[in-house]
């Protein structure tokens, strides 16, 4: 297929929710929402943990629970955020007042970093204490997020690095 000869509309359809690749990922249960990057990151994290005996097995939680994406067989709660660059910023952590009151919403935060091909580049694991240390308040959005920095990468647990 010569992509240069396709119109913008034809190209858009190839990456749309009605595309064959999207529908197949949906049929496999990988894409449960329209957040493709986030869903791929969750899949890669859970797959990696499941296939490495020294890591706990994780199961996806029902979409929609704020800051809760997976749980381990030990009952630990995981939040999973996915970015597409080692210089990215995670999505939002909502309910800032509970965060400011240090109400622990999860045991671990996994930051999944994908490369330009949406392949796994890195998985960082942060404890609640790490999250609390590195979180930044977004005044405009009234929420928290975390920026991926060298300091963050050097100070938290690296689960996977390509």
Regions found by a protein language model. Give the residues of each.
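Nucleic-acid endonuclease domains
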Residues: 1-77, 81-162
């Amino acid at each position: 297929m010569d992509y240069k000869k396709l119109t913008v509309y034809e190209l858009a359809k190839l990456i749309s929710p009605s595309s064959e690749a999207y529908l197949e990922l949906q049929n496999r249960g990988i894409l449960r929402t329209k957040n493709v990057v986030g869903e791929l990151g969750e899949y890669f994290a859970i797959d990696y943990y499941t296939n490495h005996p020294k890591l706990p097995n994780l199961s996806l939680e029902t979409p929609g629970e704020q800051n809760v994406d997976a749980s381990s067989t030990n009952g630990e709660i995981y939040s999973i955020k996915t970015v597409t660059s080692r210089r990215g910023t995670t999505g939002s952590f909502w309910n800032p007042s509970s965060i400011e009151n240090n109400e622990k919403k999860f045991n671990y935060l996994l930051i999944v970093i994908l490369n330009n091909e949406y392949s796994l580049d890195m998985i960082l694991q942060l404890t609640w204490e790490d999250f609390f240390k590195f979180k930044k308040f977004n005044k405009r959005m009234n929420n928290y997020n975390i920026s991926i920095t060298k300091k963050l990468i050097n100070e938290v647990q690296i689960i996977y690095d390509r």
